[in-house]
Amino acid sequence: MESLTLQPIARVDGTINLPGSKSVSNRALLLAALAHGKTVLTNLLDSDDVRHMLNALTALGLSYTLSADRTRCEIIGNGGPLHAEGALELFLGNAGTAMRPLAAALCLDSNDIVLTGEPRMKERPIGHLVDALRLGGAKITYLEQENYPPLRLQGGFTGGNVDVDGSVSSQFLTALLMTAPLAPEDTVIRIKGDLVSKPYIDITLNLMKTFGVEIENQHYQQFVVKGGQSYQSPGTYLVEGDASSASYFLAAAAIKGGTVKVTGIGRNSMQGDIRFADVLEKMGATICWGDDYISCTRGELNAIDMDMNHIPDAAMTIATAALFAKGTTTLRNIYNWRVKETDRLFAMATELRKVGAEVEEGHDYIRITPPEKLNFAEIATYNDHRMAMCFSLVALSDTPVTILDPKCTAKTFPDYFEQLARISQAA
């Protein structure tokens, strides 16, 4: 297996121009495909997840052009639901941001489509979404294991009263919200359980509004969506920088700054993960906010005990930053780490112990006490881009770290390690 050893980093300083947000990129691509008119997306993320979405749109007959660096996409909308001529199988890798929204959107027309993916995708639950779509009339069959992909979709979604469990993944609600306006009837979506990752729903609603569709949000408990609507292209749309990707550079600055400035997001960003900067500030770093940047300057870091449900992806970065904080850090209400690219609670606990931390792994929390001195370790990444990026922070100690399968960052940030090196000074 390929590996990358990072030597100790004495200091970080500089500016990082963030790649486009994964969450925004794939939502914008799907809405542009469903919309009337031509949409030009700029600062699109070039990553595995986005390529899976683009490949699916190609197979569904959409036409688009990509710039050489794959960050500018002109796409001609279908002006309504996507339709496949004849039976079709779409392979979506491990891209949850493609699998969940497409599973819903492709139930609008009389299609016969199979959605499948990598082995890990077949372990990521989708039953709550399928149950909700079936309530709205969709005809969906599990081809292997009940409640998991692969799925066979045969249309039938017409709207109506739909319940969805919000406690595992906000992507199920996102998928329903983006699909419902194109259904022939009105849809009332009721949320069962506590809605996780609420800021990701705000991204969805924000993008739908950009494409001309507004819905009634009743305190995140119920959503009322008028049927028979259509999406309209906004013309040109700039994809925000990825706030989850910003977390690694901001944390590096908190630990070994200097000052690091990330551009492409700022105080008005629609992504909930910008709130990661508030957590660093609470730990002791200095944060400065601009309209299109956030900067972080080193501070003496202290442990925190916090509910991280609102920023589950960026919260992983706090778990490795905790290695540099004084005291024991507890991150709570993060059960949905277990249904991501890997079981992130198990993976994080396992790898933190390798570098010497004392770790308590609960059902939905993790407690981390740093060692006096970090151990050198080979970090397994579990084919999870965020594990690779989080554990790069270990090099901010006086100990090197080896990251196994470093190219797994291609899911959201193909040149992550080059960007980190650019702002790093060797010890």
Swiss-Prot record:
**What Gene3D superfamilies would the database entry show?**
Enolpyruvate transferase domain
Which InterPro entries does the record cross-reference, listed alphabetically? Enolpyruvate_Tfrase_dom (IPR001986), Enolpyruvate_Tfrase_sf (IPR036968), EPSP_synthase (IPR006264), EPSP_synthase_CS (IPR023193), RNA3'P_cycl/enolpyr_Trfase_a/b (IPR013792)
* One GO CC term, this protein: cytoplasm
Q: Which locations, inside or outside the cell, does it occupy? A: Cytoplasm
GO molecular-function annotation terms? 3-phosphoshikimate 1-carboxyvinyltransferase activity
Where is this protein chiefly located? cytoplasm
Entry-linked SUPFAM superfamilies: EPT/RTPC-like
Q: Give the UniProt keywords, A-Z.
A: Amino-acid biosynthesis, Aromatic amino acid biosynthesis, Cytoplasm, Transferase
| Binding-site residues, 3-phosphoshikimate | 22-23, 27, 169-171, 197, 313, 336, 340
Instruction: List the pathway annotation.
Output: Metabolic intermediate biosynthesis; chorismate biosynthesis; chorismate from D-erythrose 4-phosphate and phosphoenolpyruvate: step 6/7
Q: How does it assemble?
A: Monomer.
Q: Per its database record, what is this protein's job? A: Catalyzes the transfer of the enolpyruvyl moiety of phosphoenolpyruvate (PEP) to the 5-hydroxyl of shikimate-3-phosphate (S3P) to produce enolpyruvyl shikimate-3-phosphate and inorganic phosphate.
- What PANTHER family does the record tag this protein with? AROM/DEHYDROQUINATE SYNTHASE, PENTAFUNCTIONAL AROM POLYPEPTIDE
Question: Could you identify this protein by its name?
Answer: 3-phosphoshikimate 1-carboxyvinyltransferase
The encoding gene = aroA
